Design a protein with these regions (language model features):
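Long, aromatic- and glycine/proline-rich binding clefts that accommodate carbohydrate-like moieties
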Residues: 26, 129-130, 297-302, 350-406, ...
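Hinge/lid segment of periplasmic solute-binding proteins
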Residues: 25-31, 97-154, 210, 294-300, ...
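Glycine-centered hinge/linker elements that transmit conformational signals in sensory
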Residues: 181-184, 225-257, 302
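A bilobed periplasmic-binding-protein/Venus flytrap-type ligand-binding module shared by bacterial periplasmic
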Residues: 158-161, 313-327, 350
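Extracytoplasmic/periplasmic solute-binding protein
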Residues: 137-150, 155, 179-229, 272
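Short, solvent-exposed loop/beta-turn-alpha elements that line the ligand-binding surface or hinge
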Residues: 30-34, 113-131, 189-190, 196-202, ...
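Conserved C-terminal helix/tail region of periplasmic/extracytoplasmic solute-binding proteins
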Residues: 30-31, 36, 59, 64-65, ...
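Extracytoplasmic "Venus flytrap"/periplasmic binding protein-like
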Residues: 55-131, 162, 166-173, 266, ...
Length: 434
C-alpha cells in the first residue's frame, strides 16, 4: 500500500514540476552541442589510442575537440607556458605525482567532484569506484579530484624465470632474500655469460622513482609529521643504504650511471638475473626482436621490507583548466568522462596501455589474451598496495629529486650514508622553506 501511495505521490510531484525529470534521465550528451575545446596532450600510447576515436565523441556530442600532442619534454614546456599565460587551454594531460601540487597552487586545476556527482553530467555506469583507489587518491589534492587516470604504472621485480627454475632458486619474498638471491647469481657463469645479481637505476634523480618503493617498504617517508625532511631517520637511512649496497655489491659496474635505458638493456642482454623497474617495461623484455630474454621472464611484487610490501603507483591523468570558461569546462568533463569510460579503458588496455580500471583487467576480453598472467596478477596486486606519493610532496619536485639522488649515488659509492642523508635533509628543508 505504501509503495502504491509513493508512486502516486511521485507522479504528482513530477507533473507539478516539483521533482526534476533529469534526476531520472540519462545524460544528454548533446547539451553542449557547438562547444569547441582544446586539450594539450603528451605523445603517449593513450593519445595514440584515443585520437582515431575522436569522431565518435564529436558525433555523439556535437562538441569539437582539438587534441594537440607533443613529445614529452616539449609538451611539459608548452603546457606550462600556455597555462601561465592563461592561453585557451581547456584540458590537458598531467602526471599528478610530478606536477599536481605546483599546478594546484597556481590555480590551474579544476576540481571535478561536482561534475562527477551531477547526474545531468555523469552517467551512473561511468563509476568512479571502478578505478583502483590508489590512483583515485593519487589524482587528488586536498580531497579534491583533479584528474582521471588514463595510464596506470607501478614497478615490479622481474627475474630470469628459466634460471630460477633450472637452479632451483626461490623468488625472493623479503628484502633479506632479495639480497641473498642477488649474491647467489652475482659472478655466476651461465650459458657462457658472467651474470650480475641485479640491475637497478642508480643515476641520481632518475633512481628516486624506484628507490621510493624501498623507502616505503623500510618504513620510511619523504617527510615527517611536522612536514620536514625525514631523510635523517633510521628508516630512511636504512632504505638508502640497502639500495646502494645492493647495486654496488651485486649490480653492473658503474651503477651510479645507470638510467632506465642502461638498466633494462643489461637485463635484456641476459647479463642480470633480476631487475626492479617499471612494470611497463614488460613490452621491452618480451620483444623477441630486441630482447634475448623474451619468454624467459617472471614477475613479482617488491619483496617485503620491515614495513611490508609497499610499491609506489604513478599515472598520467586528464585534467581540466580552472581558468577555462564554465561551459567549456563542462564540455571538457564530458570528453574526459567519455575517454575514460569502461569501453575505452578496456580498449586502451588491449592496445597495451595499462588501465586504471579494475573492470578492464578482470574482463574476459583481456584475460583471454593475457599471455603473462604473473605480470597481470602482480601488477594488480601492486596497484592495490600502491603508495600514491611517488615523488616528494613539494612544489619544487625536480630540486628535491636531485637532492635525494645524490644520497643514492653516495650510497652506491659506499660513502657515509648517514652523513649524506643528514646533509640532504638540511638542504631539503631549506628548499621547502622558499
Amino acid at each position: 500500500m505504501r509503495r502504491r501511495i509513493g508512486c502516486v505521490v511521485l507522479a504528482g510531484l513530477l507533473c507539478a514540476g516539483m521533482v526534476s525529470a533529469t534526476a531520472f534521465a540519462a545524460v544528454d550528451w548533446k547539451q553542449l552541442q557547438g562547444a569547441e575545446i582544446r586539450f594539450l596532450m603528451n605523445k603517449h600510447p593513450f593519445t595514440t589510442y584515443i585520437e582515431p576515436k575522436m569522431s565518435e565523441f564529436e558525433k555523439m556530442t556535437g562538441i569539437k575537440v582539438t587534441l594537440e600532442s607533443f613529445p614529452e619534454d616539449q609538451f611539459r614546456n608548452k603546457r606550462l607556458i600556455e597555462l601561465n599565460a592563461r592561453g585557451k587551454v581547456d584540458g590537458y594531460m598531467i602526471m599528478p605525482g610530478q606536477d599536481e601540487l605546483h599546478y594546484w597552487k597556481a590555480g590551474w586545476l579544476q576540481p571535478m567532484d561536482a561534475y562527477i556527482a551531477d547526474p545531468a553530467l555523469t552517467e551512473a555506469d561511468w563509476d568512479l569506484k571502478d578505478f583502483f583507489p590508489s590512483f583515485t587518491k593519487a589524482s587528488s589534492v586536498e580531497g579534491k579530484q583533479i584528474g582521471i587516470v588514463i595510464n596506470a604504472e607501478t614497478s615490479l621485480l622481474s627475474y630470469r624465470k628459466d634460471l630460477f627454475t633450472r637452479l632451483n632458486v626461490k623468488v625472493p619474498e623479503t628484502m633479506k632474500e632479495l639480497e641473498e638471491v642477488a649474491k647467489f647469481f652475482h659472478g655466476k657463469e651461465v650459458d657462457g655469460k658472467k651474470m650480475v645479481g641485479i640491475t637497478l637505476r642508480g643515476k641520481g634523480a632518475a633512481a628516486t622513482s624506484q628507490w621510493v618503493d624501498f623507502l616505503y617498504s623500510f618504513g620510511g617517508s619523504w617527510t615527517n609529521a611536522q612536514g620536514k625532511s625525514n631523510f635523517a631517520s633510521a628508516e630512511d637511512i636504512a632504505a638508502f643504504k640497502f639500495y646502494g649496497d645492493l647495486l654496488r655489491n651485486y649490480g653492473p659496474q658503474g651503477g651510479a650511471m645507470l638510467h632506465w635505458a642502461e638498466s633494462t638493456s643489461s637485463f635484456m642482454e641476459g647479463k642480470a638475473a633480476m631487475i626492479y623497474d617499471a612494470n611497463v617495461f614488460k613490452a621491452l623484455y618480451e620483444n623477441p626482436k630486441e630482447s634475448k630474454v623474451a619468454g624467459k621472464v617472471g614477475y613479482a611484487t617488491i619483496p617485503a621490507g620491515p614495513a611490508g610490501r609497499l610499491p609506489h603507483v604513478s599515472n598520467w591523468s586528464l585534467s581540466i583548466n580552472r581558468n577555462s570558461a564554465p561551459e567549456r569546462q563542462k564540455a571538457a568533463w564530458l570528453f574526459i568522462q567519455w575517454a575514460t569510460n569502461k569501453n575505452n579503458c578496456l580498449g586502451a588496455l588491449l592496445a597495451g596501455v595499462p588501465a586504471g580500471r579494475a573492470s578492464a583487467w578482470n574482463s574476459k576480453e583481456y584475460k583471454s589474451k593475457d599471455d603473462h598472467q604473473d605480470w597481470t596478477a602482480n601488477t594488480m596486486k601492486s596497484f592495490q598496495l600502491g603508495q600514491p606519493q611517488w615523488n616528494p610532496p613539494v612544489i619544487n619536485v625536480p630540486e628535491i629529486r636531485d637532492i635525494t639522488g645524490q644520497v643514492i649515488v653516495d650510497a652506491i659509492e659506499g660513502k657515509d650514508v648517514a652523513a649524506s642523508a643528514k646533509k640532504a635533509a638540511e638542504l631539503m628543508d631549506k628548499k621547502m622553506e622558499r
